[in-house]
Structure formats: C-alpha cells, structure tokens
Amino acid sequence: MKKDIHPKLHKATVRCHCGYESELYSTIGEEVSTEICSNCHPFYTGKQRFVDTAGRIDRFKKKFANFDAASKVKGN
C-alpha cells in the first residue's frame, strides 16, 4: 500500500436523543448526533411511536390541501 494516501481514522461517538451512545471509527468527525437509532426505533423496539420531527406531514397536507378541489374545477 502507498503511504500517506489514506484518510485518518478518528474514534467517533454517536449520540442519539434517547440517550444511547456508541463508539465507532470514522474519517469524518469525532462526534455525531442523531434523532433516532436502533435503540429507540419502532421497528426494533416493537412499540408504535409517531416520529415526525421535521413537520413533514404538516407540510405535505398544506401543500396538497387544495389538490382534489383544483382537479374537480379543471374537469379531470
């Protein structure tokens, strides 16, 4: 292998909002924050939980609120 062409590895800590922390090696940074992880994700826990931190559902409903009414006016 060639020397000095590979990125440096740092020990990184991944922190979730639920309090779970994990250590891994990364070339990007030393600390990573995430909103959801395997410790609190509904698929892995078996518990139903509504996850919409960015308000995406509200934005979708607002964007397409008049979609059905507009298509009836056009005659489609």
Curated annotation (Swiss-Prot):
Binding site for Zn(2+): C16, C18, C37, C40
GO BP annotation list: translation
Keywords from the named record: Metal-binding, Ribonucleoprotein, Ribosomal protein, RNA-binding, rRNA-binding, Zinc
Gene Ontology cellular component annotations, sorted alphabetically: ribonucleoprotein complex; ribosome
A Pfam family that the UniProt record links to this protein: Ribosomal_L31
Cofactor detail note: Binds 1 zinc ion per subunit.
Signal peptide start-end: none
Chaperone keyword on record: no
InterPro entries for the chain: Ribosomal_bL28/bL31-like_sf, Ribosomal_bL31, Ribosomal_bL31_A, Ribosomal_bL31_sf
Gene3D superfamilies: Ribosomal protein L31
Source domain of life: Bacteria
Cofactor(s) in the UniProt record: Zn(2+)
UniProt GO MF annotations: metal ion binding; rRNA binding; structural constituent of ribosome
Main function: Binds the 23S rRNA.
Assembly and interaction partners: Part of the 50S ribosomal subunit.
Family: Belongs to the bacterial ribosomal protein bL31 family. Type A subfamily.
Entry protein name: Large ribosomal subunit protein bL31
Source organism: Maridesulfovibrio salexigens (strain ATCC 14822 / DSM 2638 / NCIMB 8403 / VKM B-1763) (Desulfovibrio salexigens)
